[in-house]
Structure formats: C-alpha cells, structure tokens
Amino acid sequence: MASLALNTQADPEIELFVKAGSDGESIGNCPFCQRLFMILWLKGVKFNVTTIDTARKPEELKDLAPGTNPPFLIYNKELKTDFIKIEEFLEKTLAPPRYPHLSPKYKESFDVGCNLFAKFSAYIKNTQKEANKNFEKSLLREFKRLDDYLNTPLLDEIDPDSTEERTLSRRLFLDGDQLTLADCSLLPKLNIIKVAAKKYRDFDIPAEFSGVWRYLHNAYAREEFAHTCPEDKEIENTYASVAKQ
C-alpha cells in the first residue's frame, strides 16, 4: 500500500482507498476512484489516500473490507463501500458553511454525458473491423450532444437586461465556472476515452467540438482533476486485452 495526505485544516478522519497502478503504488485506472478523490479534494477537507494493489491484496485489507474492491472510504472509523452512497454521504455531511456544496444546479449537467462511456466501451471492445465506423459514429453522436450542451449558454449566463444576445457559452465546466459532482463523474471517463481510443482506434476527439475541447482544457488546468488522473500507460494497460484491433 502507498499513502499520501492532503492537509488543509482540522477535519473528520477520512481515508480513501483507491486502486493502485501496475507498480502497486501509484494511482491506477479507476474512474470511480478518481470521482471520489476529486470530490474530497474539492470539498477542501483533510484526507488520506491509500492505493490498493488489487492483484496482491494485502492482509490488512482482508480484515478491513473483506470482499470489497476500491473505491471505499473510512469516515471517522466507519467503513463505507458503495461509491454512489459515499458520494451522497459526503455531499450531505461535508456541507456549508464549512464545506462547499458540489451538486450541479442544472439536471442536464449530470445527464448530458451519461451515454458516452457505454458508446466508447462498445467501440473499444468491437471485434469486427468493418463495424468500427458504426461504433465510431455512435460515439461521435454522444460527443456532439455534449458539445452542443457546453456551447449553449446556461440561464445564468443570459443577462435579461443586456441588449447583446449571447449565443455561445463561455463557461468553464458543465454547470458553470465551478467544478461540480457532474464533472467529477464525467471527466475521469472523458480522460479514459481520450487516451484509450487514441491508442487502440487512432481516434481523436474532433477539433470541431470546440465546447468539449474548451471543457477539457479548463479541466486539465485544475489540480483536482489533473493530479488525480492515472498515467496514460495505466489506461492503455487496462484496455490492452479488450481492445480487439
């Protein structure tokens, strides 16, 4: 196991367990692990991160969380294992005024990218080369939907008293200029798609999707995302056996 601590102030005792990389120490490829990692970082709470080598589960893990794979969390000595419930718990418990709310204001911010990863998975696992174009088209349709949403101004961006009509959004992220739970869910998956689809399908997100690229550029500039991403090789290794070229 490898541990690192992120210190800010006196807080609850929190330890997040995430999947380790191929070296057994670094951060591994697990979008759900990264999702919780980002949430805790954005909350501004003090917490420890421990990487778990799932290939060689340490003895202490068998006692701590038998039959459980990362991510899981210990909050004030209480084990929590369902990542969706963990997310809900953290949003409810680490709340204002001390900690920021991360829930998005607009429901579509959560919904808009919900099919992207499934389309990518079908594309990367396809074994019939002649069908690749159809799978790619399905993936591109989902990227177009995301791009349209990111380029369409939210209600918060529209000034009813202005004589200028804003036709193109300038916001940084899905729900505005702050990262939210919606970004914590989508961004780890987008990073996987960008890396694995390029490696095994020579697929690049088209430059014409300016909203998607603006979003990714802004996201990689934030340490809460960039510093929780696995190395590209970890993503490539994950898909090496399933990507039928």
UniProtKB/Swiss-Prot annotation:
Q: Which InterPro entries match?
A: CLIC, CLIC_N, Glutathione-S-Trfase_C-like, Glutathione-S-Trfase_C_sf, Glutathione_S-Trfase, GST_C_CLIC-2, Thioredoxin-like_sf
Q: Which residues bind glutathione?
A: E25, H227
Q: What is its EC number?
A: 1.8.-.-, 1.11.1.-
Major location, coarse class? cytoplasm
What range(s) does the GST C-terminal domain occupy?
A: 76-239
Q: Where is this motif: G-site?
A: 30-33
The reply to whether Ribosomal protein figures as a keyword in the UniProt entry is no
Please report any disulfide bonds recorded for this protein chain, giving both cysteine positions. C30-C33
Q: Which CDD domains match?
A: GST_C_CLIC2, GST_N_CLIC
Kindly indicate whether the keyword Cell membrane belongs to this entry: no
Alphabetized UniProt keyword annotations: Chloride, Chloride channel, Cytoplasm, Disulfide bond, Ion channel, Ion transport, Membrane, Oxidoreductase, Transmembrane, Transmembrane helix, Transport, Voltage-gated channel
**One GO CC term on file:** chloride channel complex
Membrane topology per the entry is: Single-pass membrane protein
Catalysed reaction(s) here are:
chloride(in) = chloride(out); tert-butyl hydroperoxide + 2 glutathione = tert-butanol + glutathione disulfide + H2O; cumene hydroperoxide + 2 glutathione = 2-phenylpropan-2-ol + glutathione disulfide + H2O
Q: Where in the cell is it found?
A: Cytoplasm; Membrane
Q: What biological processes does GO assign it?
A: chloride transport; regulation of release of sequestered calcium ion into cytosol by sarcoplasmic reticulum
Transmembrane residues, as ranges? 32-52
Question: PROSITE patterns, per this entry?
Answer: GST_CTER (PS50405)
Q: Which GO terms describe its molecular function?
A: chloride channel activity; glutathione peroxidase activity
Similarity-based family: Belongs to the chloride channel CLIC family.
Subunit structure comment from the entry? Monomer. Interacts with TRAPPC2 and RYR2.
Job description of the protein: In the soluble state, catalyzes glutaredoxin-like thiol disulfide exchange reactions with reduced glutathione as electron donor. Displays weak glutathione peroxidase activity. Can insert into membranes and form chloride ion channels. Membrane insertion seems to be redox-regulated and may occur only under oxidizing conditions. Modulates the activity of RYR2 and inhibits calcium influx.
Record text about domains = Members of this family may change from a globular, soluble state to a state where the N-terminal domain is inserted into the membrane and functions as a chloride channel. The redox status of the active cysteine in Cys-X-X-Cys motif likely determines the capacity to adopt a soluble or membrane-inserted state. A conformation change of the N-terminal domain is thought to expose hydrophobic surfaces that trigger membrane insertion.
* Record's protein name: Chloride intracellular channel protein 2
The uppermost taxa in this organism's lineage are: Eukaryota, Metazoa, Chordata, Craniata, Vertebrata
